[in-house]
Amino acid sequence: MYRSFILIAIADSNESLELKDMNNISSHRYLTMDVFSERVFEGNPLAVFPDATGISDITMQQIATELNLAETAFIAPPTRPDCAVSVRIFTPKRELSFAGHPTIGTSFVVLEEEFVPRGTSEFILEEKIGPVRIRVEPDIRPLIWLATPSITFGRLCDPDLCAKALGLNVSDLLEISPQVVSAGNPTLIVGVRDKEQVDQSWLENAGLSLLKSEDEPPLLVMVFTPTRDGAYSRVFGPEHGVREDPATGSATGPLAAFMVKNELVSGAAGTRFISEQGVKMGRRSILHVQLNGEKGVNGIEIGGYVSPVAEGTMKLYV
């Protein structure tokens, strides 16, 4: 296993870091992995710190910014007796209450580090949004499922503005109103006619300003097209410090609910399909979807495989 070392100096911006401060060092092991992929160098990269004890909120954010992955997750002891561990999730810009690929990746670490007994098939993670249920489906490597938090449907968005913001023609869009749907992170879902339009779409900050007001919470934008196997999609998150995300579990639950609502996929309990994401950016990801609830709106599970990549130690001079 490749092992790396990163040294970061944390100091007050108004004070110089003196040599004597170098005696106060804390070391923190971290793991990197590719989530929603069965092979390395695909899927969505993630860093997980198995023991974040003693790392402050500010330093967690600094670490996430330094690593500059879509998200970095930090594991700590739970405050709830029914949860295996507590998880904090940070993008390079902010902390998230919930995110899909960090939840799947952290669950893989929980299994590998034996935070739960070997052979455990179900457990709960404590996240800021609340308890998140995890289910493990045995395979050559485990297929890990998360129960999507409660989904809410928000405002509709003008198709002309959506097309303009994404660099498309309004005729490229499906005849279904784009809509904000949330399972913790509000996501504007825009359906287009085929994969070519998905790959042509792009979102800059100027385009984002057409889609939301400044007082709204940060918005993800998902562009998708229905496929024989489910969906083909891209997700843009400039407000989260992520221009394009290779795999977005927190947006895939809302996508599934949106597709069921608009009769693009069956809402019958037990329905399974996939969302293929990240292809355009060379990080092909496969997100598995299973519908377990009435009309597919609740009881949605998102599943994926995890490929471990590297292990390292971060030394913080504090």
Which residues does each predicted region cover?
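Active-site proximal loop and beta-alpha junction motif in alpha/beta enzyme cores
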Residues: L19-F98, I104-V318
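Short, Lys/Arg-enriched N-terminal segments with co-localized hydrophobic residues
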Residues: R3-D21
